[in-house]
């Protein structure tokens, strides 16, 4: 039995931190896991910038409310779910993701949680498990699922490489050049076709 595991930001919705960097006028916050493979280091750096500028959860949530899904993302998910179980696996946080899940038709999402002070300052974060994407696909495999995975960033490579089939989607030129063995696609139609084909192969 197959289950498809998808990254969220950059695949189905725009990058939240890039949108917030633009809304807040803080260009440093545009750095994502496409640029920095160490997520823990990236998040601590982000929290330092938020503190420095006196910004907290409320300001980020106001930006998230205005973000829409990427064109075609909802239709892609709806079509994919007609022939495969689907789980979205993201390093984002429940507190950011909820409004976006509504726009995607409430798919199943595995993500993380923030530690927030009474005044709204984000003081820390709690990762569900170490290497959550890779750990999740391995856990699914341990209970009898064949996994198919797709994402755009460094932190997706573990689940992509550990799955029966894995694909890069709208990734960077550098990641595609560094991992030429991983098929890379730019459109939802191509990705749907690749997932279907992988499920047909014994």
Go through the PLM ranges and name each one.
Residues 113-116, 171-175, 189-191:
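Short, acidic/turn-prone active-site loops that include or flank metal/cofactor-
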Residues 194-201:
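Short amphipathic alpha-helix with an adjacent loop that forms part of the alpha/beta core around
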Residues 128, 182-191:
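Short acidic-hydrophobic, aromatic-tinged amphipathic segments that line or gate anion-handling sites
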Residues 94-98, 156-157, 192:
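Short, well-ordered alpha-helical microsegments
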Residues 78, 138, 157-158:
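Alpha-helical segments flanking ligand/cofactor-binding loops in enzyme cores
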Residues 86-91, 145-186:
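Acidic, Mg2+-coordinating phosphoryl-transfer loop and its flanking beta/alpha structural elements
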Residues 95-147:
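Substrate-recognition "cap/lid" segment bordering the active-site pocket of phosphatases
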Residues 2-113, 117-118:
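Alpha-helical substrate-recognition element adjacent to the catalytic core
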């Amino acid at each position: 039995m197959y289950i498809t595991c998808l990254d969220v930001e950059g695949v189905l919705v725009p990058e939240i931190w890039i949108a917030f960097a633009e809304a807040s006028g803080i260009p440093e916050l545009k750095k994502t896991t496409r640029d920095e493979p160490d997520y823990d280091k990236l998040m601590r750096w982000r929290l330092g910038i938020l503190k420095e500028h006196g910004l907290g959860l409320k300001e980020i949530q106001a930006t998230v409310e205005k973000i829409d899904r990427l064109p075609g993302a909802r239709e892609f998910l709806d079509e994919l779910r007609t022939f495969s179980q689907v789980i979205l696996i993201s390093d984002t946080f429940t507190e950011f993701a909820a409004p976006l899940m509504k726009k995607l038709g409430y798919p199943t999402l595995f993500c993380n949680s923030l530690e927030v002070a009474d005044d709204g300052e984000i003081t820390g974060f709690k990762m569900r498990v170490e290497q959550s994407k890779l750990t999740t696909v391995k856990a699914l495999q341990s209970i009898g699922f064949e996994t198919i995975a797709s994402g755009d960033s460094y932190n997706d490579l573990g689940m992509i490489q550990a799955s029966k089939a894995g694909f890069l989607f709208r990734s960077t030129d550098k990641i595609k050049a560094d991992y030429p063995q991983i098929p890379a696609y730019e459109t939802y139609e191509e990705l749907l076709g690749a997932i279907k084909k992988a499920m047909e192969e014994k």
